[in-house]
């Protein structure tokens, strides 16, 4: 979460909760090959003594929990869990929304309907709207692991390291002794096979050492889009 994001979240009353839970970092380092000396360093907060850090690392489910708590505290918000929007009709001065819950359908009329339901938004689908942008022909393996480690809270990025030759790797520290490793794995891969523990864990040990003790939290593949 960037400083700008935290400034916005402050306006919603949840910025401090994110900072209190998150791992603060300002410094990033870039390495090449097996060289232990970074080829480049940067500081996301060159002007010190600001209210918020350059970045914090925090799992998304914590941010969603804090935002949900803030919304639930508002007197003019009605939260309806388990309700699915299945249809909508746009009128000149309002929108008519069809909702289904437990097999029962009902309708709501509102001035505005805001699509905040992610990149596979059913709202956007009902309106035949797509996310314009570019899909990069590459895949990345996310390995979220828990382990005890004294590495500094910095963003470390490798080009062509010996533990992932010809590709890149990113390492981030997160709360609760969680570490996120992003391995670039290429385009034409078997996505299911790439996330099997017997294929992921040799990568982790090649990077962190054979003796490292860690616990799997989450392995997945993502494709970068913007």
Label for each model-derived stretch:
Residues 87-108, 113:
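Conserved beta-strand-loop-beta-strand element in the redox core of flavoprotein oxidoreductases
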Residues 35, 101-105, 164-166:
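Glycine-centered tight beta-turn/hairpin loop motif at sheet-sheet or coil-to-beta transitions
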Residues 41, 107-109, 142:
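Well-ordered beta-strand positions in beta-sheet-rich domains
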Residues 69, 92-94, 112, 116-225:
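Conserved FAD-binding catalytic core of PHBH/FMO-like flavoproteins
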Residues 1-72, 89, 172:
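Active-site-adjacent segment of FAD-dependent monooxygenases/related oxidoreductases
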């Amino acid at each position: 979460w960037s400083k700008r994001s935290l400034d916005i979240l402050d306006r919603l009353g949840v910025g401090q909760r994110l900072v209190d839970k998150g791992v603060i970092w300002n410094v990033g380092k870039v390495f090449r090959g097996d060289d232990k000396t970074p080829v480049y360093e940067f500081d996301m907060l060159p002007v010190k003594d600001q209210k918020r850090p350059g970045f914090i690392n925090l799992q998304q489910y914590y941010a969603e929990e804090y935002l949900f708590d803030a919304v639930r505290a508002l007197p003019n918000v009605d939260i309806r869990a388990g309700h699915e929007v299945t249809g909508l009709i746009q009128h000149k001065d309002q929108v008519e929304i069809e909702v289904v819950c437990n097999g029962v359908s009902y309708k709501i009329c509102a001035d505005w309907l805001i699509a905040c339901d992610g990149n596979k938004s059913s709202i956007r689908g009902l309106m035949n709207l797509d996310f314009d942008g570019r899909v990069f022909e590459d895949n990345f393996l996310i390995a979220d692991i828990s382990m005890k480690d004294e590495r500094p809270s910095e963003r470390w990025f490798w080009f062509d390291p010996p533990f992932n030759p010809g590709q890149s790797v990113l390492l981030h520290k997160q709360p609760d002794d969680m570490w996120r490793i992003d391995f670039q794995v290429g385009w034409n891969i078997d996505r299911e096979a790439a996330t099997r523990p017997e294929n992921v864990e040799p990568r982790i040990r090649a990077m962190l050492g054979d003796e490292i003790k860690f616990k799997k939290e989450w392995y997945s593949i993502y494709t970068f889009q913007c």
